[in-house]
């Protein structure tokens, strides 16, 4: 398995993220993962499907919330740079990466949870 250069992944994602959503979170996070040196061959199309895909490329589930994700206080997650959050909400879900200051996907987010309603959220950390 390839080694993960978290710094390169985060540099690419932070540099290329927009100020508002482009509806392309999975593409942006996937490209960041690739910029960090990990192949995403066989990747899924929708963001929510990365819950099953990330463990195949060296990421471990470190935190999961079901149900009241929107109402959850996310401050105790202790996210580290490079952690990836996958939300199973809506048609395609959402995926984003913590850059050490904020959650980023195809845009620079104000919060991790970007939806108005509740759903499921899984957070992954690279352990390859």
Q: What is each of the regions a protein language model found here?
A:
Residues 1-17, 64, 69-74, 116-128:
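Non-catalytic ligand/cofactor/substrate-binding and regulatory segments of enzyme domains
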Residues 43-117:
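...with weaker cross-activation on analogous glycine-rich loops/strands in unrelated enzymes
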């Amino acid at each position: 398995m390839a080694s993960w250069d978290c710094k390169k992944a985060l540099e690419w994602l932070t540099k290329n993220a927009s100020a508002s959503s482009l509806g392309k979170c999975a593409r942006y996070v996937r490209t960041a993962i690739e910029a960090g040196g990990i192949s995403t061959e066989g990747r899924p199309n929708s963001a929510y499907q990365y819950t099953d895909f990330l463990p195949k490329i060296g990421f471990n589930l470190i935190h999961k919330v079901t149900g009241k994700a929107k109402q959850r206080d996310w401050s105790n997650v202790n996210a580290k740079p490079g952690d990836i959050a996958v939300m199973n909400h809506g048609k395609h879900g959402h995926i984003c990466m913590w850059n050490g200051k904020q959650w980023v996907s195809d845009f620079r987010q104000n919060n991790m949870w970007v939806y108005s309603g509740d759903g499921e959220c899984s957070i992954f950390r690279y352990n390859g």
